[in-house]
């Protein structure tokens, strides 16, 4: 059994443990994923591969991650499309921006993408989002069309705490988001 653990407690301009793609960058202790313009894509990836699947045994590892984020938009009605925490092959490249959140190119299921994402979706896309039109947190498997969603009441400018956990024995991925203040 192998354990991988790391902690990124501060961001800075010389961030060695992250790979930035597209518009992603760090400055002033902040990670910024996109510019304030339409259809941009920015990503930050951990620089060392993390093995969660053993190709010899087929076993999948449990994992837990936690992070804090703030969406600080000029107004609470126009906050772009959102962002994702995702797990993908190490050679993954940025995909289509906008509603595809830089992770997918199509709403159709694609088993070759080998991607699992938790989306924090702030914009209703009629082609694949839940019909209620709410902002939501979704679990995506090889497609931007979520296999499970829960409505999310975004608190613009407020710090949110997230915990994402996968239990390999039950094959269940859970997501928790709280606003501490």
From Swiss-Prot:
UniProt keyword list: Calcium, Lectin, Manganese, Mannose-binding, Metal-binding
Binding annotation for Mn(2+): 119, 121, 129, 136
Annotated positions binding Ca(2+): 121, 123, 125, 129
InterPro entries linked: ConA-like_dom_sf, Lectin_legB_Mn/Ca_BS, Legume_lectin_dom, Leguminous_Lectin
Misc remark: Binds one manganese (or another transition metal) ion and one calcium ion. The metal ions are essential for the saccharide-binding and cell-agglutinating activities. The sequence shown is that of the beta-1.
Membership in a protein family: Belongs to the leguminous lectin family.
Name of the featured protein: Lectin beta-1 and beta-2 chains
The species this protein was found in: Lathyrus ochrus
């Amino acid at each position: 059994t192998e354990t991988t653990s790391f902690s990124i407690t501060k961001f800075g301009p010389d961030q060695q443990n992250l790979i930035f793609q597209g518009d992603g960058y760090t400055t002033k202790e902040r990670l910024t994923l996109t510019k304030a313009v339409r259809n941009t894509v920015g990503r930050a990836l951990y620089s060392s591969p993390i093995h969660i699947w053993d190709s010899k045994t087929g076993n999948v590892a449990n994992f837990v991650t936690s992070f804090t984020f703030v969406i600080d938009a000029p107004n609470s009605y126009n906050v772009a499309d959102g962002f994702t925490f995702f797990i993908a092959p190490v050679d993954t490249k940025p995909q289509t921006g906008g509603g595809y959140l830089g992770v997918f190119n199509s709403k159709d299921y694609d088993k070759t993408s080998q991607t699992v994402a938790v989306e924090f979706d702030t914009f209703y896309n009629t082609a694949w989002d839940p019909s209620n039109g709410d902002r939501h947190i979704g679990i995506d498997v090889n497609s931007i069309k979520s296999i499970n969603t829960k409505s999310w009441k975004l608190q613009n400018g407020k710090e949110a705490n997230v915990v994402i956990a996968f239990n390999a024995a039950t094959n269940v991925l859970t997501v928790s988001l709280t606003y501490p203040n």
